Amino acid sequence: MENWATEKEFLDLWAVNYKTGEPIPADLIAKIVAAENYQAAYFNVRQVAYALNDMAWHSIDTPFEGDVELFERTAMAPSQILPVVDGAAMSPAFSHIFAGGYAAGYYGYKWAEVLAADAFSLFKEKGIFNPEVAEAFRREILSKGGHEHPMTLYVNFRGHKPETKALIEKMGLEKSSEK
């Protein structure tokens, strides 16, 4: 899980100045996080638009014989925040949803982020190097593979179904409850 990459406690173990041995300054970590979260809201709305478009295409029961641009515009309307550009249609070039193994599953990108952030929030609660949490993650998630339903595994680890709150905080879209 990439979430450790911007944790000061983790970075202090190895991210040091090669000459002085001084650990990476907290203000530099904050700048890295801010850069990572730049336009996070827009990026997320775009990902939702792509997922809506994907699901719309894969919900058609008969061969499509209509206007691709209009179909796409209608599918993505709930997440439209910028003016539509006439003549622009991304679907013909969106190989992820037709040839990339993500047919009707593009939403998986965002869902994976939700799972990772929510799971990591338990490490943040208990300490990012907490051996009990790490063991529970290994035991309940990693060691089970496909032997049980993924949601069952997740709930066994986390104690509840995935929540979006941790991802929203991670992206800087809501203030963290941490002090």
Task: Label the model's feature ranges.
Residues M1-K179:
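Cation-handling catalytic/transport regions enriched in His/Asp/Glu
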